[in-house]
């Protein structure tokens, strides 16, 4: 029984030791994203669009009035994913 308790304690210490560097990396990534230069007004956004998923013209004017957004991690309720956005080195869902 003592052996089991000692092994469990060692496991918990090992997991905690691994969690701290992970949290540090997450903090560094967040800090890097917050340091977006404001002096460069040019932003590059790359979109990948799948035409087979495009809404059909069964409802006139649907495409003209459709609003699309790049979202993480997924589309909101009522939206549909039509492709992928690549922005700031991350992959976003292209939702309409």
UniProtKB/Swiss-Prot annotation:
<comment type="subunit">
    <text>Tetramer. Dimer. Interacts with RETN.</text>
</comment>
<feature type="propeptide">
    <location>
        <begin position="20"/>
        <end position="66"/>
    </location>
</feature>
<protein>
    <recommendedName>
        <fullName>Neutrophil defensin 1</fullName>
    </recommendedName>
</protein>
<dbReference type="InterPro" id="IPR006080">
    <property type="entry name" value="Beta/alpha-defensin_C"/>
</dbReference>
<dbReference type="GO" id="GO:0031640">
    <property type="term" value="P:killing of cells of another organism"/>
</dbReference>
<feature type="disulfide bond">
    <location>
        <begin position="70"/>
        <end position="85"/>
    </location>
</feature>
<keyword id="KW-1015">Disulfide bond</keyword>
<dbReference type="GO" id="GO:0050829">
    <property type="term" value="P:defense response to Gram-negative bacterium"/>
</dbReference>
<keyword id="KW-0964">Secreted</keyword>
<keyword id="KW-0295">Fungicide</keyword>
<keyword id="KW-0732">Signal</keyword>
<dbReference type="GO" id="GO:0002227">
    <property type="term" value="P:innate immune response in mucosa"/>
</dbReference>
<comment type="function">
    <text>Effector molecule of the innate immune system that acts via antibiotic-like properties against a broad array of infectious agents including bacteria, fungi, and viruses or by promoting the activation and maturation of some APCs. Interacts with the essential precursor of cell wall synthesis lipid II to inhibit bacterial cell wall synthesis. Inhibits adenovirus infection via inhibition of viral disassembly at the vertex region, thereby restricting the release of internal capsid protein pVI, which is required for endosomal membrane penetration during cell entry.</text>
</comment>
<dbReference type="InterPro" id="IPR006081">
    <property type="entry name" value="Alpha-defensin_C"/>
</dbReference>
<dbReference type="GO" id="GO:0019731">
    <property type="term" value="P:antibacterial humoral response"/>
</dbReference>
<dbReference type="Pfam" id="PF00323">
    <property type="entry name" value="Defensin_1"/>
</dbReference>
<keyword id="KW-0044">Antibiotic</keyword>
<feature type="disulfide bond">
    <location>
        <begin position="68"/>
        <end position="96"/>
    </location>
</feature>
<dbReference type="InterPro" id="IPR002366">
    <property type="entry name" value="Alpha-defensin_N"/>
</dbReference>
<feature type="signal peptide">
    <location>
        <begin position="1"/>
        <end position="19"/>
    </location>
</feature>
<keyword id="KW-0597">Phosphoprotein</keyword>
<dbReference type="GO" id="GO:0005615">
    <property type="term" value="C:extracellular space"/>
</dbReference>
<feature type="disulfide bond">
    <location>
        <begin position="75"/>
        <end position="95"/>
    </location>
</feature>
<dbReference type="GO" id="GO:0071222">
    <property type="term" value="P:cellular response to lipopolysaccharide"/>
</dbReference>
<dbReference type="GO" id="GO:0061844">
    <property type="term" value="P:antimicrobial humoral immune response mediated by antimicrobial peptide"/>
</dbReference>
<keyword id="KW-0929">Antimicrobial</keyword>
<dbReference type="GO" id="GO:0050832">
    <property type="term" value="P:defense response to fungus"/>
</dbReference>
<dbReference type="Pfam" id="PF00879">
    <property type="entry name" value="Defensin_propep"/>
</dbReference>
<feature type="modified residue" description="Phosphotyrosine">
    <location>
        <position position="87"/>
    </location>
</feature>
<dbReference type="GO" id="GO:0051673">
    <property type="term" value="P:disruption of plasma membrane integrity in another organism"/>
</dbReference>
<keyword id="KW-0211">Defensin</keyword>
<dbReference type="InterPro" id="IPR016327">
    <property type="entry name" value="Alpha-defensin"/>
</dbReference>
<dbReference type="GO" id="GO:0050830">
    <property type="term" value="P:defense response to Gram-positive bacterium"/>
</dbReference>
<comment type="similarity">
    <text>Belongs to the alpha-defensin family.</text>
</comment>
């Amino acid at each position: 029984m003592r052996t089991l308790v000692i092994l469990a304690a060692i496991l918990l210490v090992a997991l905690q030791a691994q969690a701290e560097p992970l949290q540090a990396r997450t903090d560094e990534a967040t800090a890097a994203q917050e340091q977006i230069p404001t002096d460069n007004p040019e932003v590059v956004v790359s979109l990948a669009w799948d035409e087979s998923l495009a809404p059909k013209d069964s409802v006139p004017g649907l495409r003209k009035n459709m609003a699309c957004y790049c979202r993480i991690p997924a589309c909101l309720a009522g939206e549909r994913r039509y492709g992928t956005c690549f922005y700031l080195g991350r992959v976003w869902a292209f939702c309409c």
